[in-house]
């Protein structure tokens, strides 16, 4: 990996640029970010960080266990015109598979919190983080609250909370009680008379009515009052949401959590269109891994070996980060130049809504079709034209044939 490329500096510049190019989606003056994990399959035996990974959902095309890299990623919500909102990818890092020191006790939750706090410091803004139930932990909430940030997440159905303890009129010996009666959220979900009905605010749902209820109770993992929202959905069942921001309305909580799927849609585009996770860099001097192996412990390896692993890990991160930037720029073009993209698409789709921002695939195809205009006038960007002429593809990309089909 070239020492001239600092991935952290590149990421910080990209995060700041996102706020300039797009209009961020804000809630109570806070930027809304989405976090999730992705597993990139890798069969390389000499690729640092490759380990056996478990996938929750199984199927014929998605085995239960794979070998690959485990990454955690973050996106920021921005306004996307008639499409509502979009999730611009910010950062993606490998957070499993390598243990450089046996004194390192950081978990995936600790590493994600570090990403959130670092990005927030780049913006000098407060953040509302939206994540799934895996991140509903005190290890995430306490550091975020300490810096003035908030978390919106989903809870498991067996979650419990506590009422605030009643304070006696006269102070007695000992520490005053903090936690009162224990309350199971699934019991609150059975009290039908306490629920209100409203139209579903979730993106893409029309004609769907939901029943909801909000309560504020003590949650022991963080030792403070948080806001719980219980939602009865006619198709998705009962949903339990948690927000550390006590001012969020129940329907706003449901609406924001509904946007969480946009990062998963972004993962699909990153894998199948951008190729952000299609790297195959390997390390010649690395000890080969076997199928089923777990973390690679490097505290007994030589300094040169560990330096080689760090360089290779930096190469992975640089490749993925450039993929995030490329995908984000495609989304920017789709949002801000919708008509121009459709006009230069030059192909056909079964479902084409010219008033909606196109997908990354359509934008990439439009850029390819107009590449000759840039090359026809090299004086516009001589260095870029030289690079494009040297590395251009002579064969049509496979996704172009799929679109035409």
Q: Which functions belong to the PLM regions below?
A:
Residues 2-85, 93, 200:
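Active-site-proximal, Lys/Arg-enriched surface segment
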Residues 14, 29, 46, 83-405:
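Single, function-defining residue in the core of a domain
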